[in-house]
């Protein structure tokens, strides 16, 4: 079953109100994404994994992935496309603060548009379901960098620049090898398999009762 972005938003809010907090959803989303990635790649021990994160909850999922991948002994670099004080949500802030206590994960911040990495894998946690208007810097340069880099590319929830509701794209967008979205498939995502690559919808523990009156 495919659902709309608004339905997903309402299901998340209802689940949160039931006591299944959004930070639990974020934790389970990041963990499920890493499980899929590790299953695909096999051993990620010592692999250079670069995670681009935006300032919202899509970035927060990427922050959770960073912690889990460090547990697999990957060499993880997180590139936050902005300043930590501008992280938008409590859940993402909470996960950033954990990474700040983890020397095993390299943290980079700021609005740079000059990326000099040699990754084996890139995780796109830049933009999620809240896409609107033209994509600006530093996000645009990060997306360009992802597309120009020869490595395995993994999108969290949706490739950045793809509207998960309509399947339409912004002025710039990522092209990935695998996309893992959460709870249920959003209507627009499967329309662009050329951007998503392999596509999975993973359960993240939201109670089925959270769907009542919405689906």
From Swiss-Prot:
Q: Which residues form a coiled coil?
A: none
Q: What is its EC number?
A: 5.1.99.6
Put simply, this protein is called: NAD(P)H-hydrate epimerase
List each copy of the YjeF N-terminal domain by range.
8-212
Acetylation: is it a keyword of this entry? no
Provide the gene name from the record: nnrE
Residues recorded as binding (6S)-NADPHX, renumbered to this chain, are 57-61, 128-134, 139, 157
Q: Does the keyword Mitochondrion apply?
A: no
Recorded source organism is Nitrosopumilus maritimus (strain SCM1)
Q: Where does the record locate the signal sequence feature?
A: none
Described by its record, this protein's role is as follows: Catalyzes the epimerization of the S- and R-forms of NAD(P)HX, a damaged form of NAD(P)H that is a result of enzymatic or heat-dependent hydration. This is a prerequisite for the S-specific NAD(P)H-hydrate dehydratase to allow the repair of both epimers of NAD(P)HX.
Enzyme class, first EC level, given as a word: isomerase
PANTHER family referenced in this protein's UniProt entry, alphabetically: NAD(P)H-HYDRATE EPIMERASE
Q: Which family does it belong to?
A: Belongs to the NnrE/AIBP family.
Q: Give the required cofactors.
A: K(+)
User: Molecular function (GO) terms listed?
Assistant: metal ion binding; NAD(P)HX epimerase activity; nucleotide binding
Among NCBIfam families, the record links this protein to: yjeF_nterm
Reaction(s) catalysed by this chain's protein:
(6R)-NADHX = (6S)-NADHX; (6R)-NADPHX = (6S)-NADPHX
Keywords from UniProt, A to Z, are: Isomerase, Metal-binding, NAD, NADP, Nucleotide-binding, Potassium
Residues that bind K(+) = 58, 124, 160
State the free-text cofactor note: Binds 1 potassium ion per subunit.
The record's section on InterPro entries has: YjeF_N_dom, YjeF_N_dom_sf, YJEFN_prot_NAXE-like
């Amino acid at each position: 079953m495919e659902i709309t972005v608004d339905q997903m938003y309402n299901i998340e809010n209802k689940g949160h109100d039931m006591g299944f907090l959004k930070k639990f959803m974020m934790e389970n989303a990041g963990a499920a994404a890493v499980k899929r990635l590790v299953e695909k790649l096999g051993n990620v021990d010592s692999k250079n994994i670069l995670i681009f994160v935006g300032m919202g909850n899509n970035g927060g999922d990427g922050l959770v992935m960073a912690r889990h991948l460090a547990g697999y002994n990957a060499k993880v670099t997180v590139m936050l496309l902005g300043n930590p004080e501008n992280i938008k949500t409590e859940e993402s802030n909470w996960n950033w603060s954990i990474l700040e206590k983890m020397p095993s994960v390299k943290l980079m911040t700021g609005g740079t548009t000059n990326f000099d990495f040699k990754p084996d894998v890139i995780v796109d946690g830049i933009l999620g379901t809240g896409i609107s208007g033209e994509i600006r810097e530093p996000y645009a340069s990060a997306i360009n960098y992802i597309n120009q880099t020869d490595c395995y590319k993994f999108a969290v929830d949706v490739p950045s620049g793809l509207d998960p509701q309509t399947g339409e794209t912004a002025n710039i967008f990522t092209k990935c090898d695998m996309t893992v979205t959460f709870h249920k498939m959003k209507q627009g995502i499967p329309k662009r398999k050329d951007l998503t690559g392999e596509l999975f919808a993973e359960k993240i523990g939201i109670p089925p009762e959270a769907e009542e009156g919405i689906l």
